[in-house]
Amino acid sequence: MSSLADLINLDLSDSTDQIIAEYIWIGGSGLDMRSKARTLPGPVTDPSQLPKWNYDGSSTGQAPGDDSEVIIYPQAIFKDPFRRGNNILVMCDAYTPAGEPIPTNKRHAAAKIFEDPSVVAEETWYGIEQEYTLLQKDIKWPVGWPVGGFPGPQGPYYCGVGADKAFGRDIVDSHYKACLYAGINVSGTNGEVMPGQWEFQVGPTVGIAAADQVWVARYILERITELAGVVLSLDPKPIPGDWNGAGAHTNYSTKSMREDGGYEVIKKAIEKLGLRHKEHIAAYGEGNERRLTGKHETADINTFLWGVANRGASIRVGRDTEQAGKGYFEDRRPASNMDPYTVTSMIAESTILWKP
């Protein structure tokens, strides 16, 4: 091998049947991602074929030093775009040795909601628009911004093209392709309103798989920014002032909404979401009050409002849905740092299971 790059890209399939499985879990902040790798004897196609594992929870803020073992359960498998071949990424959730979900394990409660027969019958679809900001490593300032200064006002950057408008496209496109390789249902990307901010969309994907895919897409993005020497930020308002924040708009539909007469089902679901507005806001991401101000294409955090084609609303219904009399709606309240397990399951619970 002539270089480090050759070794990184070394194909093991001709020399061994063994594979590398990268186990991924959510750390103590509820947002940080951790991972470690292990060797397995051969290719794996289902999480049930994988062994549970453990890690030092005292080093992630998830367990005390005198009882530090946390157990991770494999839940979803993806192809590894970094090692390739038969190697895999494994999304896990975390439990105590006694089998109880630890506090940062939001997947466990979400799975119970998605396994409810009423929710299963409705075949919930999600499309999640994950916005994020790329920061310069040493100064934590958006890429493309002058050090200690600001770029020109917002306007030319949204879906912009050119060296003075789009900053970090190589990272964005690498991430797009890596997610498709991994088996994540990424449906698109675009540059956002604030320079240095981008978005990728996951979906439509059914049930809890939508959240699994968003988490692994975040992991892949963080690995790519690591290689690029850039810092990934999911802060919902990374730059104060007259700059757009970052959200995770969540598009949602049920089988009943997608069928004839579904628009009435949509309106009833939105009414229920309005009745639980405070509960949803409390679960929709840390620091969201800095983003949901009623400006920059947001509704005020204390006000629930819905409308057709209204990007200043809490819930937006598309013109095509209104005209067809069926379809989906967009919950614009979730922040970029939201937990997709919490948000997707809470929307399903409020619209299908909850009785006012």
Swiss-Prot record:
Induction profile:
Down-regulated by ammonium supply.
Q: Which SMART domains match?
A: Gln-synt_C (SM01230)
Q: Does the keyword ATP-binding apply?
A: yes
Q: Where is the GS catalytic domain?
A: 106-356
Keywords for this protein: Acetylation, ATP-binding, Cytoplasm, Ligase, Nitrogen fixation, Nucleotide-binding, Phosphoprotein
Q: Which domain of life is it from?
A: Eukaryota
Its job:
High-affinity glutamine synthetase. May contribute to the homeostatic control of glutamine synthesis in roots.
Q: Which residues form the GS beta-grasp domain?
A: 19-99
Gene Ontology cellular-component terms for this entry are: cytosol; plastid
Biological process annotations from GO: glutamine biosynthetic process; nitrate assimilation
Q: Which molecular-function annotations from GO does this UniProt entry contain?
A: ATP binding; glutamine synthetase activity
Task: Using the UniProt annotation, give all residue ranges assigned to the region (Disordered).
Answer: 37-66
Q: Where in the cell is it found?
A: Cytoplasm
Residues that bear Phosphoserine = S2, S48
Q: Which Pfam families match?
A: Gln-synt_C
- Tell me what happens on changing S174A: 6-fold decrease in affinity for ammonium and catalytic efficiency
Which family would the database say this protein is a member of? Answer: Belongs to the glutamine synthetase family.
Report the main location listed first in the record: cytoplasm
Recorded catalytic reaction(s): these are: L-glutamate + NH4(+) + ATP = L-glutamine + ADP + phosphate + H(+)
Q: In which tissues is it expressed?
A: Expressed in the pericycle in the region of lateral root emergence.
Question: EC number(s) per UniProt?
Answer: 6.3.1.2
Entries under InterPro entries matching the protein: Gln_synt_N, Gln_synt_N_sf, Gln_synth/guanido_kin_cat_dom, Gln_synth_cat_dom, Gln_synth_gly_rich_site, Gln_synth_N_conserv_site, Glutamine_Synthetase
Name of the protein described by the UniProt record: Glutamine synthetase cytosolic isozyme 1-4
